[in-house]
Structures are given as C-alpha cells and as structure tokens.
Amino acid sequence: MHNLIFAILCSVAVSVLLKVARKKNIIIEQAIAFNYIVAISLSYFLLKPDFKGLEFTEYLAQSDSTPIFLALGILLPTVFIIMSKAVEFAGIVRSDAAQRLSLFLPIVASFIIFHETLSQPKIVGIILAFIGLFCILNKSNEQSAVTFKGILGLIGVWFGYGTIDILFKQVAKSGGAFPTTLFITFSLAACVMFLYLFLKRTQWTVPSFIGGIILGVLNFFNILFYIKAHQSFGQNPTLVFAGMNIGVICLGTITGAFFFKEKISQINWFGVFISLSAIFCLYYLDKILA
C-alpha cells in the first residue's frame, strides 16, 4: 500500500507545481518537455535498463513490448496537449471531470483484460468510488455551453487518460523488464514533445527549464510508484486504479482548500468521505468478510 500512497503524494505534488507554474513564469509545455529529459536520466541511472546487448533501435524492433512503448510514448505528451485544448474550449472543471471519470475504462479493463474476480465488496467499492467522484467534482458555478471542439477535447481526455492507466498496468506485468520500458517510453515522449515545441517555434525560458527539472523528478517517481503498486496488487488492479484516482482527487481537494483557499462545498466534503469509504471497501472488505 505504501507504493500507492507515495504515487498519490507525487501526483498531487505535480498538480500543485502545475498550479503555481504560471505565476512563476513557467511555460508548462516547455516544462513537460524538460521533464522527460529528467525522467530519461533517472530511468537510466536508477533503474538501469537492460537492452540485452542490443542497440536502442534493435531492441525497439525486436521487443514484444514495442506496441506499449509506442502507444505510451505518443499518448503521454499528446494527451497533455489535448488536455490543454479541452481546458481552452470546454473549461477546467469539465476537463478535470473527464480526466477523473476516465477511471471507468481501466475498471472495465480490470475484469475484461486482466481477468480480476468481481466480488460483492468490489462492486460496492466501485459504486461508492463513482458516487464520491461525482460529489467531489460537483461545482455550483454556472458554465457556458460546450462547443463541438470542446466535446472532442473532453472525449480525447477521457479516452487518453483511461488508456494510459491500462498501458501502465501492462508495463507492471512485464516484471523486471519495466525499467527498459520506461526508459524507451520517456525517450519517445521527449521526441514527440520537443518536435511539437519546435514546430510551434517556442521561445525557451530558464524558469521553464528549472520547473521541468522539478516536474521530472516528481513525475518519474509518481509513475515508478504507480507501477510498483500494480505489481504489489497484481491480482487486484481495481484497487490501484480506483485508489490512485480517488486518492489524488481527495488529497488534491484538501490541498486546494487549505493551501489555495479554494471553496469546497458540503457535497464535496461528502464526496471525500464516500471516496475514502470506497478505498476501504476495495482493500479491506474482502478480508473482513473472508
């Protein structure tokens, strides 16, 4: 469980960094690009990827995990870009809701792809998880009608984040080979993001570089602990998918209330309570009823 807790803490720290980035003159797109360079370095020096004596391109061509490398390497930066467009055309509240409700996809995958056993406590936990998410995401402020571009952006966010979660579970199943998978994934993601920025002819800034270093450290350990959590709960992916999503939004809500003075309604606090109850059901209820 400690891996999941560390992953949640790192993820919320990433959110806090992105929240204060613009006030510090950090261009988020540039920070994301530099973040991948840091992640590549940490993967190489800490995880020591094993290419089995092959060159980078040879390993990429021969590995059975190449589809995962390519999918994650493209999706990680692309979904970020889609998220920024969704925020622009549909608003941050709707975009955040789409990201959180993407939990539906990995939950379905847990039982269809990863063959997790569906028990009554898990059904209760899943239902409570979505009730909690809806309550936390409930906002009283009125929003304008969403445009067609906004709808496409929200669908992209929902599908993209859900697919990334499923792919990281596949990475976790690779066992000791996951350091190599992460190294290649980050390398491909860096290429995609830097290509995007060069095509935009972005003006590079020092604050963005510094922010990218910090972001890279936090993001690397967020992903590392998330994968290790999946390996620890190999037979219970629902707990990791739901626990990560719920934990991030609950801690993020509390952090926003206490550090950024964000207004949290009673129904939001009720959602936090229900969400924590969902994690209890997913982790403990099976053991209690056994």
Task: Identify the function of each model-found stretch.
Residues 1-290:
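Polytopic alpha-helical membrane proteins, predominantly small-molecule transporters/carriers
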